[in-house]
Amino acid sequence: MFVDQVKVYVKGGDGGNGMVAFRREKYVPKGGPAGGDGGNGADVVFEVDEGLRTLMDFRYKRHFKADRGEHGMSKNQHGRNAEEMIVKVPPGTVVTDAETEQVLADLTEHGQRAVIAKGGRGGRGNSRFATPANPAPQLSENGEPGKERDVILELKVLADVGLVGFPSVGKSTLLSIVSSAKPKIADYHFTTLVPNLGVVETDDNRSFVMADLPGLIEGAHEGVGLGHQFLRHIERTRVIVHVIDMSALEGRDPYEDYVTINEELEQYNMRLTERPQIIVANKMDMPDAADNLAAFKEKLTDDYKVFPISAITREGLRELLFEIANQLETTPEFPLYNEEELSDNRVMYRFDEGDAPFEITRDPDGTFVITGKALERLFKMTDFSRDESVKRFSRQLRGMGVDDALRERGAQDGDIIRLLEFEFEFID
């Protein structure tokens, strides 16, 4: 089964907790704090494996949770960092954040990697908090939570040339003749439901990858006839070969077919109309095909070359393949997204924008509810079993302006404040 889109959940590993410990040795009174830091949580890294062809594996495993870092230990021993979690994806995979729709990575080359969910930093042990005023601190940090998100994986096939056209115009037959590909061929519409790739070699030893893309119909750019799934595979192609049935046995006018498909490409955007297009007048061995071709050329206003062929008799194929190879030599690649160039094995990570400021709302029962990524991160990294940690958390809230904001909202002594699952009283 060919799977080209799937939604998965990824979570970086949490950082290990820091430790509260003190040096206890004979003849060393008041040895001081000796709690080690926690290790960093593991990143979730997507890596391209050229041996994969579809996203089929993700249909059976959709949750990827990396390991957390090791906790800190006594004697200032730091916890071990967790090893990154490698998730293999096929070439041509585009990773998009499901919530923000931001493209996180476009993975095209073997070995290319992208950090999709960053692991959390390890919490600091109590030796990190020692000061002249507090030489024996009784506080440490919990590990930072790892980044978690839902992402959408889309596979957009890597091909130099894309065959487009209405269903049953002979695209699969053409690919099977000029390459060793074996697409399904039958006398009904939408026989091809997944892209088929084939390597084509010309008589002068030039080669390229050709993709037989499922047939398009009017409204494809809006998703009609699975149009979105089909059109995404054209995005990476450098040359579009537009196959038209000149026999008109389906009862459609060849020129109207041509106009309709080009309108769909234009509406879909992704700069598809900027690519060179070669028109292939197929089924020239059929009756009335020559007359239909003459009428087609009279109506054609675009400056595209038209190649009359018969995929069955192989008439005109040599000239067509030479023209495709010539166009590829002069046509650059069309990048899908404006991204920095990445070396094959470089790990890329797009940092999020700064944490949003906190927000304060009030429930019907009068409870003030505080939300915000920065505050929630501090909360999760606080060890509420230790008084010093709680006092530090209160100071952090005050320093961020939470107390003043609560007063402005009308908070008074004794009012209940909620942050995640933690409730406390407001003291003015």
Curated annotation (Swiss-Prot):
CDD domains in the record, alphabetically? Obg
Might you give the EC number(s) for this enzyme? 3.6.5.-
Which Pfam families does this UniProt record tie to the protein?
Answer: DUF1967, GTP1_OBG, MMR_HSR1
An MF annotation (GO) of this entry:
magnesium ion binding
Q: Which PROSITE patterns match?
A: G_OBG, GTP1_OBG, OBG, OCT
Q: Where does GTP bind?
A: 165-172, 190-194, 212-215, 282-285, 310-312
Record keywords, A-Z: Cytoplasm, GTP-binding, Hydrolase, Magnesium, Metal-binding, Nucleotide-binding
Q: Which cofactor does it need?
A: Mg(2+)
Biological processes annotated in GO: ribosome biogenesis
Where is the segment annotated Disordered? 118-145
Domain (OBG-type G): give its ranges: 159-329
Q: Where does Mg(2+) bind?
A: S172, T192
Uppermost EC category: hydrolase
Sorted alphabetically, which Gene3D superfamilies does this protein's record hold?
Answer: GTP-binding protein OBG, C-terminal domain, GTP1/OBG domain, P-loop containing nucleotide triphosphate hydrolases
* One Gene Ontology CC term in the entry: cytoplasm
Which InterPro entries does this UniProt record tie to the protein?
Answer: G_OBG (IPR031167), GTP-bd (IPR006073), GTP-bd_Obg/CgtA (IPR014100), GTP-bd_prot_GTP1/OBG_C_sf (IPR036346), GTP1-OBG_CS (IPR006074), GTP1_OBG_dom (IPR006169), GTP1_OBG_dom_sf (IPR036726), OBG_GTPase (IPR045086)
Q: Which HAMAP family match?
A: GTPase_Obg (MF_01454)
Function of this protein?
An essential GTPase which binds GTP, GDP and possibly (p)ppGpp with moderate affinity, with high nucleotide exchange rates and a fairly low GTP hydrolysis rate. Plays a role in control of the cell cycle, stress response, ribosome biogenesis and in those bacteria that undergo differentiation, in morphogenesis control.
Q: How does it assemble?
A: Monomer.
Spell out the family assignment given in the record's similarity comment. Belongs to the TRAFAC class OBG-HflX-like GTPase superfamily. OBG GTPase family.
Question: What's the protein called, per UniProt?
Answer: GTPase Obg
Lineage of the source organism?
Bacteria, Bacillati, Bacillota, Bacilli, Bacillales
Gene name of this polypeptide: obg
